[in-house]
Amino acid sequence: MREIVHIQAGQCGNQIGGKFWEVISDEHCIDATGTYYGDSDLQLERINVYYNEATGAKYVPRAILVDLEPGTMDSVRSGAFGQIFRPDNFVFGQSGAGNNWAKGHYTEGAELVDSVLDVVRKESEGCDCLQGFQLTHSLGGGTGSGMGTLLISKIREEYPDRIMNTFSVVPSPKVSDTVVEPYNATLSVHQLVENTDETYCIDNEALYDICFRTLKLTTPTYGDLNHLVSATMSGVTTCLRFPGQLNADLRKLAVNMVPFPRLHFFMPGFAPLTSRGSQQYRALTVPELTQQMFDAKNMMAACDPRHGRYLTVAAIFRGRMSMKEVDEQMLNIQNKNSSFFVEWIPNNCKTAVCDIPPRGLKMSATFIGNSTAIQELFKRVSEQFTAMFRRKAFLHWYTGEGMDEMEFTEAESNMNDLVSEYQQYQEATADEEGEFDEDEEGGGDE
C-alpha cells in the first residue's frame, strides 16, 4: 500500500534521518528491535508506508543510508535505533567528499551511485505500490549535496512517474562548517529546481535563531537543531503515516501545493516550539497554535513570510481538538492577513487534523507554506556565491574534479531565474491578463 522509500545521504542527512526514524518509531510504538508494543490500530493502519514487515512481526524501516565515509554511519549504527535498519541498506565509501560538491556528484559519488541504486531497486521491488522517494541531505557539504542530487537525477531517470521529495538543509554563515557552502548549495539548487517535486527548505539560520531567541539556548548544538528538524519532519509526514483525508500521499500534497513546476520550495513551520530538555507544561489552545504556526519566528526557513505572499499553504494539526474551532481559526487568519495570500488562487489554504499528538505534547501544529518570500533564502546564498565566484576563489577544487566554470555560471543564473519567478508571482494580481512570459515553464530544461 502506497510506500515511500527513504534515503539519507551524507553526514547531515544521516543525522537528521536517524533522528526522524527515532521519532516516528516512537510515535508508531516500534521499539529499537522493530517490535510493535502499542495498543492503537491507528498506529498500524498505515505503518507500511515507511516500514517493511519482516518475518516474526518485525518492522524494518524502508530506509537507505548513504555516505562517502564510514564515520556517521557507524554512529547511526551504534545509536539508540541503530539495530532497526536493514544491514544491507548501509552503503558507504571510504574516501569522503571533503565538502566538495564535484567529488560527490562527479567522481567519488559517481563510483558509489550504482551500488546505491541496486539497494533502491531492491527496496522498490519490495513495495506493493511505490508512491515516491524522500531524501534527507544538506546542501552545504559534498556528499549530501553532490551525491544526493546525483542520486535524485538517477532515480528520476528510472522512476520518472514517482514523486521525489527532499528535506534539504540550507547552509548559513551562522552555523557554518565550510567556506565553500554557497558553491555547493547553488550547484545543488540548480539540480533540485529541475528534478524534485517537493523540497522542504530547512534553514540552519532559522533553526539557530529559534534555538537562540525562542528557546533561549545560548550555544545551540547540532543536536538542538536536529531536535527541531525531527519535530518538523514528523509533523509534515503525519498525513502520510496516519489515516486521514487531506494530503494523504505525496502526490496529493504536490497537487495542492505546487502551482508552477519550478516553484516547489516549501517553508516549514512548527508550533509549539520546545527545547529538547523542557516539554511544554501547559497545553496551548487552538487559536494560540494557529497564531504561532503562522508567526515568522516559527518558520524553519530564515525568510519573513510578510515580505512575500503565500501561493499555497497546508496546515496539519495534531491532538484531540475541535475541527470546527480549527476551521474557524484558519479562516480567521486568512481573513485578517488576506494581503499575504495571492488572490488568484482561491482557497489556497488546506487543513488536516490527526488525533495522535507527538510525544510530550497535548496538541501541536505543523505548517507547510509555499511562499514567495523563500526568495530571500536563495538571494542570501546567491550573494555569498557571487562574492566568491567573482574572484574565482576555491574554484580549483572543483575544476580539479573535472568541472567547468560554465556549470557554475549556469547554476548561478538558474538560481537568479528562480528568484525572479517568485518575485513575478508575488506581484501578480488576479485581473491582469497574459503578462506572464510563456518561457517560464519551458525555460527550465537544459
Curated annotation (Swiss-Prot):
Q: Which locations, inside or outside the cell, does it occupy?
A: Cytoplasm, Cytoskeleton
Molecular function (GO) terms for this protein are: GTP binding; GTPase activity; metal ion binding; structural constituent of cytoskeleton
Tissues of expression: Testis specific.
Give me the residues that bind Mg(2+), please: E69
Keywords recorded for this protein, A-Z = Cytoplasm, Cytoskeleton, GTP-binding, Magnesium, Metal-binding, Microtubule, Nucleotide-binding
User: What do we know about how this protein assembles, alone or with others?
Assistant: Dimer of alpha and beta chains. A typical microtubule is a hollow water-filled tube with an outer diameter of 25 nm and an inner diameter of 15 nM. Alpha-beta heterodimers associate head-to-tail to form protofilaments running lengthwise along the microtubule wall with the beta-tubulin subunit facing the microtubule plus end conferring a structural polarity. Microtubules usually have 13 protofilaments but different protofilament numbers can be found in some organisms and specialized cells.
Protein family (similarity comment)? Belongs to the tubulin family.
Name under which the protein is recorded: Tubulin beta-2 chain
The gene name reads: betaTub85D
